[in-house]
């Protein structure tokens, strides 16, 4: 439990929605945004975000997410992080890769290295387009634990 609490203190995630989630029991969108807007900071279960802005490029989106995360968990030159770019279910892999490229580029400029990046669909929402970025500030113990094999519905790591 102590290791999990230490990890939790070093992890931050921020999501961007390009379309709302539709919960099957309700049958309607959980929030509304226009076609040229994005919901910033929305929840994985379709909860509305903290603000709505005009649609941004993948590079602008990556910068916005990383800058917002770093206001809450500052990173310094020499730090090492794991980055997860999670597609919410209706976002093409190419878009996820573009956002990752920008996040990696910005971290590299800050002399922060990336360990075991993850790009794909890990936790999705019904009919939602968008993505989330998770930054996990690592120490040697966390790096060792990340190398362990894992197999769950949301995450598989085949390392041995």
Residue map of PLM features:
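C-terminal non-catalytic interaction/assembly regions of soluble proteins
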Residues: 68-160
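Mixed-charge interfacial surface used for oligomerization/domain docking
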Residues: 2-98
């Amino acid at each position: 439990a102590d290791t999990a609490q230490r990890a939790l203190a070093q992890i931050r995630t921020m999501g961007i929605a390009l379309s709302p989630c539709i919960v099957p029991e309700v049958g309607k969108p959980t929030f509304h945004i226009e076609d040229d807007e994005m919901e910033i900071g929305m929840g994985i279960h379709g909860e509305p975000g903290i603000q709505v802005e005009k649609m941004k490029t993948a590079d602008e989106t990556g910068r916005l997410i990383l800058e917002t995360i770093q206001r809450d968990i500052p990173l310094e030159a020499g730090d090492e992080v794991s980055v997860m770019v999670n597609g919410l279910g209706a976002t093409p892999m190419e878009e996820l890769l573009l956002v990752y490229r920008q996040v990696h580029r910005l971290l590299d400029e800050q002399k922060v290295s990336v360990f075991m990046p993850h790009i794909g669909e890990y936790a999705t929402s019904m009919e939602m387009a968008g993505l989330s970025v998770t930054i996990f500030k690592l120490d040697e113990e966390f790096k060792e634990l990340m190398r362990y094999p894992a197999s769950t519905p949301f995450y598989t790591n085949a390392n041995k």
